[in-house]
């Protein structure tokens, strides 16, 4: 009976000492995980910000392309069809209805003044 008590006491002491080591190890492991979790949270917070910045950069790039393409249209040369309501004939030209050879056409053309 004495050996049973000694064996039980020995097993109990080993369990407690190993349990403490596991507890310390678990605590350190939890600290590492929380530190990593914080870095993941920072990364997760920055990720949408990065996506928004990329989207903003794309939109600004499109705006700059639009501003490049929004320049005034080129003028229309002599003998080219034009719109009577919105003539874009070059300087020195006027948008007129064709005479003689172009009567059958239903559009206006740029002619010299």
Curated annotation (Swiss-Prot):
Its tissue distribution reads: Expressed by the venom gland.
Role summary: Probable ion channel inhibitor.
- All disulfide bonds of the chain are 75-90, 82-95, 89-110
Q: Which protein family is named in the record?
A: Belongs to the neurotoxin 14 (magi-1) family. 01 (HNTX-16) subfamily.
Keywords noted in UniProt: Disulfide bond, Ion channel impairing toxin, Knottin, Secreted, Signal, Toxin
Return the domain comment text from this UniProt entry: The presence of a 'disulfide through disulfide knot' structurally defines this protein as a knottin.
Q: Name one Pfam family in it.
A: Toxin_22
Main localization, broad class: secreted
Q: Where is the composition biased (Basic and acidic residues)?
A: 60-69
| Region entry Disordered, spans | 60-83
Coiled-coil intervals, chain numbering: none
Q: Which GO terms describe its cellular component?
A: extracellular region
Record propeptide residues: 22-74
Name this polypeptide is given: U11-theraphotoxin-Hhn1a
Q: Where in the cell is it found?
A: Secreted
Lineage of the source organism?
Answer: Eukaryota, Metazoa, Ecdysozoa, Arthropoda, Chelicerata
The region annotated as signal peptide is 1-21
GO molecular function per UniProt:
sodium channel inhibitor activity; toxin activity
């Amino acid at each position: 009976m004495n050996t049973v008590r000694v064996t039980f006491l020995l097993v109990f002491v080993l369990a407690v000492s190993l349990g403490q080591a596991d507890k310390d190890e678990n605590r350190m492991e939890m600290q590492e995980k929380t530190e990593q979790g914080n870095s993941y949270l920072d990364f997760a917070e920055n990720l949408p910000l990065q996506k928004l910045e990329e989207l903003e950069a794309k939109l600004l790039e499109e705006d700059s392309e639009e501003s490049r393409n929004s320049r005034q249209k080129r003028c229309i040369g002599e003998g080219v069809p034009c719109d009577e309501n919105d003539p874009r004939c070059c300087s020195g030209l006027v948008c007129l209805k064709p005479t003689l050879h172009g009567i059958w056409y239903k559009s206006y053309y740029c002619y010299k003044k």
